[in-house]
Amino acid sequence: NKTLWSSYTEIIDVKQCYPNTALVGVQVDSEQFGSQQVSRNYHLRGRILQVPSNYNPQTRQYSGIWDGTLKPAYSNNMAWCLWDMLTHPRYGMGKRLGAADVDKWALYVIGQYCDQSVPDGFGGTEPRITCNAYLTTQRKAWDVLSDFCSAMRCMPVWNGQTLTFVQDRPSDKVWTYNRSNVVMPDDGAPFRYSFSALKDRHNAVEVNWIDPDNGWETATELVEDTQAIARYG
């Protein structure tokens, strides 16, 4: 009996655990694809976030006065995606920042501005700003924070006690300056105006975005300010 033992495989019947992971298994017939590698695309909703208790993420409606408490729910509101990134201890800055270190009241106002309906260009409406992204690589916390804030047209500011945010959005005027309430210089010209050069004023941009109607591939679209082009060229 000249039996030669080469190797063996042990099969252990246990239930594996994949914490903090969305795991998908797909079984396909190899005859349908031949030698080609199977590619898959998934439409994900992402993490369950902490959102205001008076907020309905599905309808984007706010009821009553917010008492400052939060509840778990799915949302693509940019402000609360930022809150999750700042306060989560596993993937975010939660080990450095606590809930009391982030100005949630400023994020509440910013989140309402993000939820306002604006024309979508096709006769309907859509939320002003949404976040449908996933973080796949480790980066510096400040870089990720800056990317989130730039998408909402806001800036992070440390006021000495908390991390707060200042957003570029329409608001009531704070003060009116005119010749009667400013110090008049010797030359008699209290106000001096400066402008950017015409060549520095951009009126066309190319936007890269994920097109769901084209297999979720990256598409490029040109967006132009036709009025500025007609005026300045």
Regions from the PLM with identified roles:
Residues 154-156:
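A structural signal for short hydrophobic beta-strand segments in well-ordered beta-sheet cores
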